[in-house]
């Protein structure tokens, strides 16, 4: 049950408000940079409008800033950098890159002192029963390094919270392919409901879990589920109301936007897939050699993962078959574990989750539970927190969000037609609601950039974005279209030259290619090529700002939890290595009914 140690102290609401006040003061000047759409970089003279410095000096200053130490303790006050030194008071243009970078670094989650160390929290939750995840759980056996890192770190924390609060039931919202859910049930013997809006994900998770259970004992015969006998103690099936699995129709799947690999809203943002801080690159070659989802700015939860099982677990090689046949011990382990797990303790369900969802309609045998989410997309993360605060059965929550660009904003003009009492993704807390604060889609999109993976000064792959920005100029000048509603998509990777890129793009957009000759197209390219460094420098400014936008979103969620009377403890925890998993912060909260030591 509960650990003897009290949970770590966390910042109170007045302290968080002070942090927010300083952050908002900085963002009022800096938000214009994050909000600028790089597709319009040349058509709207973005560099000239927002930056009063040559691009070479900006890039040089950011390179130097990247290797500087963290802000000194004496500089950590809210007024350590006067804003007029960063931005011009009259034109609002950026004047000092050094001050800009230093202030942005100061207002990151980590440097503001908002995080509760994960080791400290685990020690408090587990007390004298501290047990790390078995070292024999090798990443290669299940998934790629990134996903394995996330699942193992989060599952240990979830199990510790469940033990601390005396909970056996876990609800995994936005469960996707079921990696976390399967691990929680098989490794820790927890009763897990994995809820996703996509029938495809649900059926895939069921099949994957079925195969995994058959082979689990062969690879991990000493899991907690076997050791404590939980699986065999629960002969009953998980109860699911009839028809729940069929709720994930095409409309709800599209509304949820979960697992959609075709999102085109990120056109015009740089592809940073080949970048990482130079020092980290040497240490993390095995990580960066994999496809990087989040810094590509496509769906952060639409991971390109290998199957959950080892490659040879489904189709063993001949030598492995012989070894298995010769090993009576392995056969016995496999048969014993198979009998113990005849009743599944992981049930994938299909349902579209909102803040107003009635859990009893989805889970028939709902009991006191812990609600979790690993990289829950857009509004699903704030909805998870609202369900936690409003449903008596949900005693604790552990949520890692992603896809900030898909959040709905209450004070964004484009949403005027929505109901006033609707649950918005941002803001959640009273402080930001009173400020009527709005980030805007482009700023939220820039918050998805991964600063830790970007090598300052190492040469960003900005050519694709440069192509798109110059194309926009051609479209404006020759077709009279100042705002193109259609998206070009991933044409750049299919083209060998700017000329081919323009031709393919115009065709996709349904524009008459004959209006622009080859000579005209190449003239545009040659005229703007010397200004490509402006685009590179501007993108780096956006990357440096990205953690500040994320800090604002996370602070909003933490403040919301602090405002709730029924919440006894809440915190931000840096759960993952940001190089492996840029969306690394978990929002955690426990209700007063939990024993807090």
Curated annotation (Swiss-Prot):
Assigned keywords, A-Z: Methyltransferase, Transferase
SS bond partners: none
Single Gene Ontology BP annotation: methylation
Entry's EC annotation: 2.1.1.-
Database matches in SUPFAM superfamilies: S-adenosyl-L-methionine-dependent methyltransferases (SSF53335)
One of the record's GO molecular function terms: methyltransferase activity
Record bears the keyword Signal: no
Region (Disordered) residue spans: 245-265, 317-342
Biased composition (Polar residues): 317-326
Basic and acidic residues composition-biased segments: 245-254
Stated role: Probable methyltransferase.
PANTHER family, alphabetized: CGI-41 METHYLTRANSFERASE, METHYLTRANSFERASE-LIKE PROTEIN 25-RELATED
Name of the protein: Probable methyltransferase-like protein 25
Protein source organism: Mus musculus
Gene (name only): Mettl25
